[in-house]
Design a protein with these regions (language model features):
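Transmembrane-helix signature of 12-pass secondary carriers
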Residues: 1-362
């Protein structure tokens, strides 16, 4: 049995859940930084006298960086390793986030937010790859959704940090705290193993064999003496252009459109919601409380989706969550009271993030 087949035949155990948590924490810090901006906007705009257009640039420039970082991160991970890119990207966005706290003006803040985006964008796809390459195919969907759930935890962390620190110490404090994940890089380097398929493709077969042998021993399985490599392990990776050719073209188009809808609705609402509520006359603290409740609803959405993908399938779960999210979004927009906004906001958050998690399994 070749090395990759041995890896895939391992029973799900302590190692897989440990990897999920270790990679998930990196995802959490990523989401915390992304979520922090939505809470900072409410006070930053007033303190610096920024127009809605200027605040829009503070948000948008980060997404520009994320798009560039995602492309760069994926390609670089194939050259220098998933683990290396995962660690370096965390360092990049942690430093850039901390620098946002000392930005003297809007121009410098935009520069720092751009590099934050580059780091965040590079880390996200690599995190999914690391987990998916270690987890057996039969439970991969559930693990990817659970990994995505750390995104909700990250936004929850952002809401808590903003609630307790921004009213008391100002928006600078949130960015300083957002830079602390840089110290997590030592845990990444020590406890997260490099991707086995990557090691094989780079000719580092002995290292890949050693990792799988250790996992087999931990699982109480007989350890193979020889490191066999299947021919499939060294195949050329799928090129981007092939995604738009049969049989992938239709699926690629649909997944892109669905992803656009999920991300547009999520960021379009939750990034601006704190500022919109403040503009409606609510205090900063009350606003953060309302948004915090809505963010809490994301977590059961992920967990429900993680169960349903294995019960009724990924396609049915995704379709159901998207349909329910659309209904909730309509009533959320029609909400004429705080109660209506919070209730429909919670339900919308539940289904939106559940769909987000399922989409990542395709």
């Amino acid at each position: 049995m070749d090395i990759v087949a041995r890896l895939q035949s391992l029973p799900v155990g302590r190692f897989h859940y440990k990897l999920l948590v270790l990679v998930g924490l990196g995802w959490l810090f990523d989401a915390m930084d992304t979520g922090m901006v939505s809470f900072v906007l409410a006070t930053l705009g007033k303190e610096w006298g920024l127009s809605p257009k200027e605040l829009g640039w503070v948000v948008s420039i980060g997404f520009v960086g994320m798009a560039i970082g995602a492309v760069m991160g994926g390609r670089t991970a194939d050259k220098i390793g998933r683990k290396t890119v995962f660690a370096v990207s965390l360092v990049v966005y942690s430093i850039a986030t901390a620098l946002c706290a000392v930005a003297p003006d809007l121009g410098w803040l935009l520069v720092f937010r751009f590099f934050v985006g580059v780091g965040l964008g590079a880390q996200l796809p690599v995190a999914v790859t690391l987990v998916s390459e270690y987890v057996p195919a039969k439970v991969r969907g559930r693990f990817i959704v659970l990994l995505e759930s750390f995104w909700g935890l990250g936004w929850l962390a952002a809401a808590l940090v903003s609630y307790f620190f921004i009213p008391q110490y100002g928006w600078h404090s949130a960015f300083l705290i957002g830079g602390l994940p840089i110290f997590y890089v030592f845990f990444i380097w020590k406890y997260i193993p490099e991707s086995v398929p990557y090691l094989i493709n780079k000719g580092r077969v002995d290292e890949a064999h050693a990792i799988v042998s250790r996992l087999e021993a931990e699982a109480g399985l007989p350890v193979a003496e020889k490191a066999l490599v299947a021919q499939a392990a060294s195949k050329e990776p799928l090129r981007f252009g092939q995604l738009w050719q049969p049989p992938f073209a239709k699926r690629t188009l649909m997944l892109w459109l669905i992803w656009f809808g999920i991300v547009f609705s999520y960021y379009g609402i939750f990034t601006w919601l704190p500022k919109l509520l403040v503009d409606q006359g609510y205090t900063v603290i009350k606003t953060f409380e309302y948004v915090l409740v809505m963010i809490l609803a994301q977590l059961p959405g992920y967990f429900a989706a993680a169960v349903l993908v294995e019960k009724i399938g990924r396609k049915a779960t995704l379709a159901g969550f998207l349909f329910a999210c659309a209904i909730c979004a309509y009533f959320f927009g029609q909400g004429g009271s705080v109660t209506a906004v919070v209730v429909w906001g919670c339900l919308m958050s539940f289904f939106n993030l559940g769909a987000w998690g399922v989409h990542g399994t395709f």
